[in-house]
A protein has these predicted regions:
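Short beta-strands within extracellular/lumenal beta-sheet-rich domains
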Residues: 24-28, 58, 145-151
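A structural detector for beta-sheet-dominated domains
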Residues: 11, 21, 45, 51, ...
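One face of beta-strands
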Residues: 46, 62-64, 80-82, 102-104, ...
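Extracellularly exposed regions in secreted/surface proteins, prominently low-complexity, repeat-rich
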Residues: 122-190
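Extracytoplasmic low-complexity, Pro/Thr/Ser/Ala/Gly-rich segments
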Residues: 1-55
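Short helix-loop boundary/capping segments
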Residues: 78-144
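Exposed low-complexity, polar/acidic, P/S/T/G-rich flexible segments that act as propeptides
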Residues: 49-102, 177-190
Length: 190
């Protein structure tokens, strides 16, 4: 897949550049072993560069939109699991397996789509409970997220199935809060 790049200047002059590189998708047989199941392994790297006096960091949220042409009326399943590496401006590298799954009675009918984030980062909330986020926050002027062999799956899809990657970057400065979204090229998952 070709990946992509977008540069956007915010209202306060902060320049946000988002790059999606090393993007690939490998369609693989589903464990369901029927024409109604789709499975694909995806890889990619999202890198963000901020330029401007007010730029102090951002949150990178990579994910995929999954869609099905015809619904068979069965329950659906969409999920992602991966290994990721986070690199921030201070040179810190964090690597390890991540797992995220969004299960349930979803139905992907004509014209419907499901959002699946690649990351599922867990931390304690302000009250000591469990909190999950699909975005990786970094401080400084640069940050990146890399994912490898993340599995995306759809069940109950009787027609053409398609996916499209995205990288959403949330930037907050002293004067502005904004989101910049880079969309990847749509691809078939069977």
């Amino acid at each position: 897949l070709p990946g992509g790049s977008i540069t956007q200047t915010l209202a306060d002059g902060t320049v946000v550049t988002v790059n999606l590189t090393d993007e690939s998708a490998n369609i693989s047989p589903s464990m369901g072993s029927t024409p109604l199941h789709r499975n694909v392994w995806v890889n990619g790297k999202a890198a963000v560069t901020l330029d401007g006096a007010g730029a102090k960091g951002a949150t990178i949220t990579p994910g995929y939109i999954l869609a099905c042409q015809v619904d068979f009326g069965a329950k659906g399943d969409a999920g992602a699991s991966s290994k990721m590496t986070i690199d921030d401006e201070s040179g810190n590298l964090v690597s390890g397996p991540l797992a995220g799954k969004s299960n349930g009675a979803i139905t992907l009918g004509p014209g419907q789509a499901k959002n699946v984030t690649v990351l599922d980062l867990e931390k304690k909330d302000a009250y000591g409970g469990e909190s999950h986020t699909g975005g990786n926050k970094f401080t400084g002027k640069t940050g990146s997220v890399t994912w490898a062999d993340s599995t995306l799956g759809v069940s109950g899809c009787a027609g053409y199935a398609q996916a499209r990657s995205y990288v959403k970057v949330a930037v907050s400065t002293d004067n502005v809060s904004s989101n910049v979204t880079l969309w990847g090229q749509p691809f078939s998952i069977g």
